[in-house]
C-alpha cells in the first residue's frame, strides 16, 4: 500500500529533523492519510478511498465526490479514481475535454 493520496497525489516529502544543537538528520514527512467512505450519488454506491485529510476537505468544499472528480485533472488521480471519474462521466453524460494537437 503506497503512502499517496488517491485524489490529490500527495506523497511523502523529505526534509531534516533539526535538534536543539542544530544537528540536521534526514527524515520523511508522511501525508496524513485516512480511509474514508464517500457516497457517489451518480453511481448510487459507497466508494472507499485512502485519501489525505486535505482531500476530504476539498471533496466537501466541491460538493461531494462526484463534483470533485469531474473537476479534478486526470494527472493527480490514481488509476482507481480515474475509473470512478470515467464511470461518473458516463452516468452523468459529461464529455471529457478534447486536447487539441498543436
Swiss-Prot record:
Q: Which UniProt keywords apply?
A: Ribonucleoprotein, Ribosomal protein
Q: For this protein, what is any one GO molecular function term?
A: structural constituent of ribosome
Give Gene Ontology CC terms: cytosolic large ribosomal subunit
Q: Which domain of life is it from?
A: Bacteria
Q: Which SUPFAM superfamilies match?
A: L28p-like
Q: Name one Pfam family in it.
A: Ribosomal_L28
Q: Name one GO biological process term.
A: translation
Q: Which InterPro entries match?
A: Ribosomal_bL28 (IPR026569), Ribosomal_bL28/bL31-like_sf (IPR034704), Ribosomal_bL28_bact-type (IPR001383), Ribosomal_bL28_sf (IPR037147)
Xref: PANTHER family = 39S RIBOSOMAL PROTEIN L28, MITOCHONDRIAL (PTHR13528), LARGE RIBOSOMAL SUBUNIT PROTEIN BL28M (PTHR13528:SF2)
Q: Which family does it belong to?
A: Belongs to the bacterial ribosomal protein bL28 family.
Annotated protein name in UniProt: Large ribosomal subunit protein bL28
Amino acid at each position: 500500500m503506497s503512502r499517496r493520496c488517491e485524489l490529490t497525489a500527495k506523497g511523502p516529502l523529505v526534509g531534516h529533523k533539526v535538534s536543539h544543537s542544530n544537528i540536521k538528520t534526514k527524515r520523511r514527512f508522511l501525508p496524513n492519510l485516512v480511509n474514508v467512505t464517500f457516497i457517489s450519488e451518480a453511481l448510487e454506491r459507497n466508494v472507499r478511498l485512502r485519501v489525505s485529510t486535505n482531500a476530504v476537505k476539498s471533496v466537501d468544499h466541491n460538493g461531494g465526490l462526484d463534483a470533485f472528480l469531474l473537476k479534478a485533472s486526470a494527472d493527480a488521480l490514481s488509476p482507481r479514481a480515474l475509473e470512478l471519474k470515467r464511470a461518473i462521466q458516463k452516468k452523468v453524460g459529461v464529455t471529457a475535454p478534447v486536447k487539441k494537437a498543436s
